[in-house]
Amino acid sequence: GYEDEDEDRPFYALGLGKRPRTYSFGL
């Protein structure tokens, strides 16, 4: 979920900050 830092970590590494879902990309 949004609070799962382990899930967000790959996206932080890509410079996206959070998972694409947090940007409403429809993923």
From Swiss-Prot:
It comes from the Eukaryota. The keyword Secreted applies. GO terms for biological process: neuropeptide signaling pathway. The modification Leucine amide is found at residue 27. Keywords: Amidation, Neuropeptide, Secreted. Signal peptide: none annotated. GO terms for cellular component: extracellular region. Its main location: secreted. The keyword Secreted applies. It is found in: Secreted. May act as a neurotransmitter or neuromodulator. Belongs to the allatostatin family. This is Carcinustatin-20.
